[in-house]
Amino acid sequence: DVQLTVPSILMALLVDGLARGLISREMHDEMAIYVLIFAIGISEWPQFARVSRAATLVEKNKDYVSASTIIGVSNIVIMFKHILPNIMRPVLVIGTIGLALAILAESTLSFLGVGVPPTTPSLGTLIRLGNDFLFSGEWWITFFPAIFLVILAFSCLLYTSDAADDVRS
């Protein structure tokens, strides 16, 4: 519960700062994307754990699981054949929402100049570089990466809705 209170951007800033202090600049530039993925993943995993645990406890207490236990089905079979397929929907929904949030977090950090190095392509870096030209009449340098970022995040959320419907059927 405590880790859920720390925002992913703040956790990524903390991990990136630690990585910059512990390793050389060249190595950090080479490993920046992996550090960023690790930091965002560390900050988002409690949501997966909480949803998975809650869904598992709900499914475990249903009658068909009790009936399977009574007739002698092994715990491994119950887990993989009954419980796991039924908890996939909420986990898949949280996963695709987490993907959209991770994309936005990476873009935010790159926009702030903390994420990946400027030589690595990133939507946040493109938006930041175009921000200098925004009021000089060259608005498209910022506009198109920003629109693409919005469309990308929105498509992840649309996929969430579609994937939840597919798992349900």
Q: What do these predicted ranges mean?
A:
Residues 1-161, 169:
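Alpha-helical transmembrane segments of integral membrane proteins
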